[in-house]
């Protein structure tokens, strides 16, 4: 039964890690430089499944080392090499996550394939430095027991403690501190988010824009009917319905400014209600509120241009600027500024990237937690045997 379970684990490990390597190398969306860590880690796991576990299984089932003594020394060195490489790979991945979160702009420019390959090479060199001493320094192995040969790890106390610290305890401490730091940063940004939440533009909550000085507080925004009426006035016709207020020279000579422009001093006289040159910002806000559930991420923008006269304001535009957006309503047509889609897309793209980073960090934290729990009993007992023989 044990042999069947271990054999299944060997096949599952080889198949699963081969799929990881194949996915990273063939999928365009997974060709990010940091995914090279996963390729190298999967290669180390495949080497463990093919060169280490089968011989360990045979040694456990037979009760002695069936193979040659030379292969026993190589086997033990490879065992330490591949297992240490797997643990240090996880440590390097956690540091990569930490730098990506804390130094996003600076580190993303430095996260090149060449830099990642250099880090991977350093990981393998660290594992080699920890695994090679038993091959070079034999130490006092003591008399060989009579009977069947055994293949055991180096029993030197200094090597046991040094290899345990370098292979497990130091990387484990680094990973715990790094992921704790990432968690605190994510929690701080989550608590800060509702206070500074202002949409793609980075502003605060929506507030009504100030009305220009001299404008009536009850002034209505232009509608299609008022636009047609203003056009009729420009052609010499009077309004079909409604009362018309007297127009002062100041009102006729000064065009109304958008509500988002700074207020100008005026004589305190009320301006004409229904003028098409008035601000269209409030109407745009009303329409944005109606379509907020259907189109998330919409950002209000200032009017693109200020018409010189009511007639020109009410006339349909002959040509719209490229990249601009038009909000058509039952009361008229509002031309929103260009660049809104670009700003919104950048904000949502950045938010999606941060979400993926957090999700990937959470998955790695779970994997590393399980990995540490699986390795801790062995390294604890292995180190305890050197301290208390």
Curated annotation (Swiss-Prot):
Membrane-related topology note: Multi-pass membrane protein
UniProt keyword terms in alphabetical order: Cell membrane, Disulfide bond, G-protein coupled receptor, Membrane, Receptor, Transducer, Transmembrane, Transmembrane helix
Cellular component GO terms held in the UniProt record: cell surface; plasma membrane
Bilayer-spanning residue ranges: 1-25, 37-62, 73-95, 118-140, 157-180, 364-387
Annotated site (Implicated in catechol agonist binding): 163, 167
Extracellular side of membrane: 63-72, 141-156, 388-389
Region (Disordered): 194-216, 233-320
One GO BP annotation of this record: regulation of vasoconstriction
InterPro entries associated with the record: ADR_fam (IPR002233), ADRA2B_rcpt (IPR000207), GPCR_Rhodpsn (IPR000276), GPCR_Rhodpsn_7TM (IPR017452)
Keyword Membrane set for record: yes
GO MF annotation terms: alpha2-adrenergic receptor activity; epinephrine binding
Disulfide bridges in this chain: 72-151
Subcellular locations according to the entry: Cell membrane
Bias kind Gly residues: ranges: 196-205
Residues of the site described as Implicated in ligand binding: 79
CDD domains: 7tmA_alpha2B_AR (cd15321)
Residue ranges, compositional bias (Acidic residues): 280-302
Topology Cytoplasmic: residue spans: 26-36, 96-117, 181-363
Compositional bias segments (type: Low complexity): 255-267, 303-320
Subunit structure: Interacts with RAB26. Interacts with PPP1R9B. Interacts with GGA1, GGA2 and GGA3.
Role according to the record: Alpha-2 adrenergic receptors mediate the catecholamine-induced inhibition of adenylate cyclase through the action of G proteins.
Family indicated by similarity: Belongs to the G-protein coupled receptor 1 family. Adrenergic receptor subfamily. ADRA2B sub-subfamily.
Protein name per its UniProtKB record: Alpha-2B adrenergic receptor
